[in-house]
Amino acid sequence: MQEKKEEDLQQVLNNVSEVGIDEVGRGSIFGPVFSAVVELTEKNKFTLKKLGVTDSKKLTPKKRKLLLPKILLLSSDYGIGQSSAREIDKLGIRVATELSMIRALKKLKKKPSELLVDGPLLLRPWKGTQKNIESGDSKFISIASASIVAKVSRDNLMVRLERKYSGYLIFKNKGYGTREHLSLIKKNGITKLHRKSFLKKSNLI
């Protein structure tokens, strides 16, 4: 009888899934905004929590890189999407972020029955059930995992883009508007991957 209960519990832990989505790069002034969605069973949520998965902003770059392959291995499914700087300038950051999320969701094998979205805003194009959770990346392992996948994926792209767009220390600032980055824009001008709509607000172009 006890063995049967344990088998039933294991079945629940293996079958019940949580799907979380998060974005990174929303406030950057260079390059795309990235989104990632991750599906996890209850069992694998516990495993990742023990390994130290939490909000990507609370982890060192080294820790995020170490956790990424573990998340991908233990996820039932995942997807990554992005929207370019041009799309951000054309559509606005909220719509472009939503577009990157939808692109990530389209890479899943099946539509989730419920989606956990980090932050207070609805994912307006999504027709399924969703829950918005402020600071969700600190509360739900699926969202935290998505934040790590998105962050490492985008950071890796920034390092690669440094080879083509040198002179802005993109590998270091990851496209964010640090004082050093803004100073280099004044010195070298802007590239086609800089978000013009963001820079106009700062009177940099």
UniProtKB/Swiss-Prot annotation:
<dbReference type="GO" id="GO:0004523">
    <property type="term" value="F:RNA-DNA hybrid ribonuclease activity"/>
</dbReference>
<feature type="binding site">
    <location>
        <position position="118"/>
    </location>
    <ligand>
        <name>a divalent metal cation</name>
    </ligand>
</feature>
<feature type="binding site">
    <location>
        <position position="22"/>
    </location>
    <ligand>
        <name>a divalent metal cation</name>
    </ligand>
</feature>
<dbReference type="GO" id="GO:0032299">
    <property type="term" value="C:ribonuclease H2 complex"/>
</dbReference>
<keyword id="KW-0963">Cytoplasm</keyword>
<comment type="similarity">
    <text>Belongs to the RNase HII family.</text>
</comment>
<keyword id="KW-0378">Hydrolase</keyword>
<dbReference type="InterPro" id="IPR036397">
    <property type="entry name" value="RNaseH_sf"/>
</dbReference>
<dbReference type="GO" id="GO:0043137">
    <property type="term" value="P:DNA replication, removal of RNA primer"/>
</dbReference>
<comment type="function">
    <text>Endonuclease that specifically degrades the RNA of RNA-DNA hybrids.</text>
</comment>
<feature type="binding site">
    <location>
        <position position="23"/>
    </location>
    <ligand>
        <name>a divalent metal cation</name>
    </ligand>
</feature>
<dbReference type="InterPro" id="IPR012337">
    <property type="entry name" value="RNaseH-like_sf"/>
</dbReference>
<dbReference type="InterPro" id="IPR022898">
    <property type="entry name" value="RNase_HII"/>
</dbReference>
<keyword id="KW-0479">Metal-binding</keyword>
<keyword id="KW-0255">Endonuclease</keyword>
<dbReference type="GO" id="GO:0006298">
    <property type="term" value="P:mismatch repair"/>
</dbReference>
<protein>
    <recommendedName>
        <fullName>Ribonuclease HII</fullName>
        <ecNumber>3.1.26.4</ecNumber>
    </recommendedName>
</protein>
<dbReference type="InterPro" id="IPR024567">
    <property type="entry name" value="RNase_HII/HIII_dom"/>
</dbReference>
<dbReference type="Pfam" id="PF01351">
    <property type="entry name" value="RNase_HII"/>
</dbReference>
<feature type="domain" description="RNase H type-2">
    <location>
        <begin position="16"/>
        <end position="205"/>
    </location>
</feature>
<keyword id="KW-0464">Manganese</keyword>
<dbReference type="GO" id="GO:0003723">
    <property type="term" value="F:RNA binding"/>
</dbReference>
<dbReference type="GO" id="GO:0030145">
    <property type="term" value="F:manganese ion binding"/>
</dbReference>
<dbReference type="GO" id="GO:0005737">
    <property type="term" value="C:cytoplasm"/>
</dbReference>
<keyword id="KW-0540">Nuclease</keyword>
<dbReference type="InterPro" id="IPR001352">
    <property type="entry name" value="RNase_HII/HIII"/>
</dbReference>
